[in-house]
């Protein structure tokens, strides 16, 4: 049950592109998520974006660094950044991503 939400209770169906960076020492890292045409922007949705919530069997990882991208005044995409400040946070994120990838038929590729 690995899922991503931008508003509590509204599961995001759009599959993101994710870019990972990690410090040379492994002490910190970032994950940049890009969601094109997320369902939070669907016409029938009235909830506002309150953050990015990565939810799985271990609990929840939260990022408040979420930005909307607009084209011609209409919402088009969401970019969210998750900052990991310790090796434990990195490992926790990777466990979430393994579950999310497995449930959504995704795979990891190095750039």
Swiss-Prot record:
The keyword Plastid does not apply. InterPro entries: Psb28_c1_sf, PSII_Psb28_class-1. The keyword Membrane applies. GO terms for cellular component: photosystem II oxygen evolving complex; plasma membrane-derived thylakoid membrane. One of its GO terms (biological process) is photosynthesis. Keywords: Membrane, Photosynthesis, Photosystem II, Thylakoid. It is found in: Cellular thylakoid membrane. It is a peripheral membrane protein. It comes from the Bacteria. Part of the photosystem II complex. Belongs to the Psb28 family. This is Photosystem II reaction center Psb28 protein. It comes from Gloeothece citriformis (strain PCC 7424) (Cyanothece sp. (strain PCC 7424)).
């Amino acid at each position: 049950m690995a899922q991503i939400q931008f508003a509590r209770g509204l599961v995001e169906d759009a599959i993101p592109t994710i870019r990972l960076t990690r410090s040379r020492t492994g002490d910190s890292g970032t994950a940049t998520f890009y969601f094109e045409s997320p369902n939070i922007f669907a016409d029938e949705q009235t909830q506002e974006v309150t953050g990015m919530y990565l939810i799985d069997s271990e609990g929840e990882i939260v990022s408040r660094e979420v930005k909307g991208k607009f084209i011609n005044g209409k919402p088009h995409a969401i970019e969210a950044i998750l900052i990991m400040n310790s090796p434990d946070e990195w490992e926790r994120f990777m466990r979430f991503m393994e579950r999310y990838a497995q449930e959504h038929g995704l795979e990891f590729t190095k750039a």
